[in-house]
A protein has these predicted regions:
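Multi-pass alpha-helical transmembrane bundles in non-GPCR membrane proteins
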Residues: 1-117
């Protein structure tokens, strides 16, 4: 039995839709934009996948708490993934490198914090 049917279904549907949308973006974009668009599409799919797992599984409290932390950690990654195309295409040189390092560094700190606490 599914723990939260609507959330589970809507978030599970988000995974293939995110992958399909990401693929369409790749087909429409120049090759130099592909790494940033891959970060966007894959982190979106990861976020929906982690959320679908959390909302689907009926499990003991300890496992649910871990899945909830994974769900929240994936949100940090998607925030960085959604900034990436804008920063990669909108900035140049050192500004781009600094902004990407800052956004991804903060996201990884958030992931680490959320997985540990």
């Amino acid at each position: 039995m599914v723990r939260e049917p609507f959330n589970a279904l809507s978030h599970a549907l988000g995974v293939p839709l995110a992958l399909l949308g990401g693929l369409l973006l790749l087909l429409l974009a120049p090759r130099e934009a592909w790494p940033a668009l891959l970060a966007f599409g894959l982190t979106m799919a990861l976020m929906f996948g982690a959320s679908a797992l959390y909302h689907t599984l009926k499990a003991e409290d300890r496992l649910l708490a871990w899945l909830r932390r994974l769900d929240h950690a994936a949100i940090f990654l998607f925030i960085a993934g959604s900034y990436t195309p804008f920063l990669a295409e909108g900035l140049e040189g050192g500004d781009k490198a600094l902004a990407l390092a800052l956004v991804w560094g903060l996201a990884l700190l958030g992931v680490g914090f959320r997985l540990l606490y």
